[in-house]
Curated annotation (Swiss-Prot):
<feature type="active site" description="Proton acceptor">
    <location>
        <position position="381"/>
    </location>
</feature>
<feature type="binding site">
    <location>
        <position position="102"/>
    </location>
    <ligand>
        <name>substrate</name>
    </ligand>
</feature>
<keyword id="KW-0326">Glycosidase</keyword>
<dbReference type="InterPro" id="IPR001371">
    <property type="entry name" value="Glyco_hydro_14B_pln"/>
</dbReference>
<keyword id="KW-0119">Carbohydrate metabolism</keyword>
<feature type="binding site">
    <location>
        <position position="94"/>
    </location>
    <ligand>
        <name>substrate</name>
    </ligand>
</feature>
<dbReference type="InterPro" id="IPR018238">
    <property type="entry name" value="Glyco_hydro_14_CS"/>
</dbReference>
<feature type="binding site">
    <location>
        <position position="296"/>
    </location>
    <ligand>
        <name>substrate</name>
    </ligand>
</feature>
<dbReference type="GO" id="GO:0016161">
    <property type="term" value="F:beta-amylase activity"/>
</dbReference>
<feature type="binding site">
    <location>
        <position position="343"/>
    </location>
    <ligand>
        <name>substrate</name>
    </ligand>
</feature>
<dbReference type="Pfam" id="PF01373">
    <property type="entry name" value="Glyco_hydro_14"/>
</dbReference>
<dbReference type="InterPro" id="IPR017853">
    <property type="entry name" value="Glycoside_hydrolase_SF"/>
</dbReference>
<keyword id="KW-0624">Polysaccharide degradation</keyword>
<comment type="similarity">
    <text>Belongs to the glycosyl hydrolase 14 family.</text>
</comment>
<feature type="binding site">
    <location>
        <begin position="382"/>
        <end position="383"/>
    </location>
    <ligand>
        <name>substrate</name>
    </ligand>
</feature>
<protein>
    <recommendedName>
        <fullName>Beta-amylase</fullName>
        <ecNumber>3.2.1.2</ecNumber>
    </recommendedName>
</protein>
<dbReference type="GO" id="GO:0000272">
    <property type="term" value="P:polysaccharide catabolic process"/>
</dbReference>
Length: 496
């Protein structure tokens, strides 16, 4: 039975629920407010703290450059406020459609796709020249080819417009969290494993840097390093290969050579710079607001146990057994006073097939530990819909890896967890009953708490980002540090 105890409240981890993808449809209409209201009321009664929602660029700015229409989202946000829930808003600069679980299709704005007709290199491109229209290539971040604006300026203008149009909801602290979209699925990564191009789990994926802008960037970097003869990889295989069938990832493969290391450093640094630049713009846009900024990092757990970590490398995470690819991201997040939001919290190694060389548990431990060592807040999500006690218990374990502390704050505690996703399946009675138990256990057996100060989550006005982090400091962060120890199971089971 839930209660309220001052010390136990310091163990409280808020729970948010991701709203369905098509709540606001592709025509910018809030489709079923009454149906959603009914579900939001049930979530609030279950003790849920808030909801997360994609705010689609392809919907808001679809009519033309800087022609924003926030009206449907405004009415949705007001409904969320009426229902007594907090809001996490994702600046979704990616396409919906083509990824795991995408049931609706929301492309990028048509005026952007039109530019892509004459200049297809604005999109990520694999070695065989297939374009991916999910998200603009990092190569155009600073190219003023979008009616005079760069991609970064587009994202910046969008966030400023959001702040202006949602100022009342920001002031009333309904919107508490801005998730800054940095890539496909809103995640800081390359679209290395696109289902709509035939990728299937556990394929290693493909590098996505063969558009002319990224190719030019690589050639310039190679020339500067005294190796103008170096080209982008041509030996890394295709989407559904295994590492050993490629020259690049095989034992003693290209990835371990000077040329391979140079490429992987460049490829991953492009991603770091991209995240850093857009977070800087987000920080300027929301400066002084009582909100947290956050970024999403993808849980690429397949091939994690192989020495080459191939699937992580193609996605842009240069993570090997002797090189930490995630702590540099945490460093950048810390510069902007942001949160690192990680996925696959529900997965256990024992559930994975051995041919994927997968270890979601070790990956989660590594990424969360790296965040905590950099003194940032870490939040998370489940990757796939689950309604069973085993998955919920795993999420609770990751939320408090060393259990609750009855005398005060626990040593390790995630900042929050967002459950994927609100659906008729979740609201089905037996599923919802166990979900309600999950919420209580995440709250450390405490009643719902409307005052975040009581669990040390007061949000001060957003401060300006710190100074740019020097390359040598980022490089230092690639040195592996052992993760914090995790309990083998949670002390707050939903079925305990």
């Amino acid at each position: 039975m839930a209660t309220s105890n001052k010390n136990m409240l310091l163990n409280y981890v808020p729970v948010y629920v991701m709203l369905p993808l098509g709540v606001i449809n592709v025509n910018n209409v809030f489709e079923d407010p009454d149906g959603l209201k009914e579900q939001l009321v049930q979530l609030r009664a279950a003790g849920v703290d808030g909801v997360m929602i994609d705010v689609w660029w392809g919907i808001i700015e679809q009519k033309g450059p800087k022609e924003y229409d926030w009206s449907a989202y405004k009415s949705l946000f007001q409904l969320v406020q009426k229902c007594g829930l907090k809001l996490q808003a994702i600046m979704s600069f990616h396409q919906c459609g083509g990824n795991v679980g995408d049931v609706v299709n929301i492309p990028l704005p048509k005026w952007v796709l039109d530019i892509g007709e004459s200049d297809p290199d604005i999109f990520y491109t694999n070695r065989s020249g297939i374009r991916n229209q999910e998200y603009l290539s990092i190569g155009v971040d600073n190219k003023p080819i979008f009616h005079g604006r760069t991609a970064i300026e587009i994202y910046s203008d969008y966030m400023k417009s959001f702040r202006e149009n949602m100022s009342d909801l920001l002031k009333s602290e309904v919107i508490i969290d801005i998730e800054v979209g940095l890539g496909p699925a809103g995640e800081l990564r390359y679209p290395s494993y696109p289902q709509n191009q035939g990728w299937q789990f556990p394929g290693i994926g493909e590098f996505q840097c063969y558009d002319k802008y990224l190719r030019e960037s690589f050639k310039a970097a190679a020339a500067k390093a005294g190796h103008s003869e170096w080209e982008l990889p041509d030996d890394a295989g295709t989407y559904n290969d295994v590492p050993e069938s490629t020259e690049f990832f095989k034992t003693n493969g290209t990835y371990l050579t000077e040329k391979g290391k140079f490429f992987l450093t460049w490829y991953s640094n492009q991603l770091l710079n991209h995240g850093d630049q857009i977070l800087d713009e987000a920080n300027k846009a929301f400066l002084g607001c009582k909100v947290k900024l956050a970024i999403k990092v993808s849980g690429i757990h397949w091939w994690y146990k192989a020495p080459n970590h191939a699937a992580e490398l193609t996605a842009g995470y240069y993570n090997l057994d002797d090189r930490d690819g995630y702590r540099p991201i945490a460093k950048i997040v810390s510069r902007h006073h942001a949160i690192l939001n990680f996925t696959c919290l529900e997965m256990r190694d024992s559930e994975q097939s051995s041919d994927a060389h997968s270890s979601p548990q070790k990956l989660v431990q590594q990424v969360l530990s790296g965040g905590w060592r950099e003194n940032i807040e870490v939040a998370g999500e489940n990757a796939l819909s689950r309604y069973d006690a085993t998955a919920y218990n795993q999420i609770i374990l990751n939320a408090r890896p060393q259990g609750v502390n009855k005398d005060g704050p626990p040593k390790l505690r995630m900042y929050g967890v967002t459950y994927l996703r609100l659906s008729d399946d979740l609201m089905q009675q037996s599923n919802f009953d166990i979900f309600k138990k999950f919420v209580v256990k995440m709250h450390a057996d405490q009643d719902y708490c409307s005052d975040p100060e009581k669990y040390n989550h007061g949000i001060p006005p957003l401060k300006r980002s710190g100074p740019k982090i020097p390359d040598d400091v980022l490089n230092e962060a690639t040195k592996p540090i052992p993760p914090f120890p995790w309990d083998s199971e949670t002390d707050m089971k939903v079925d305990g």
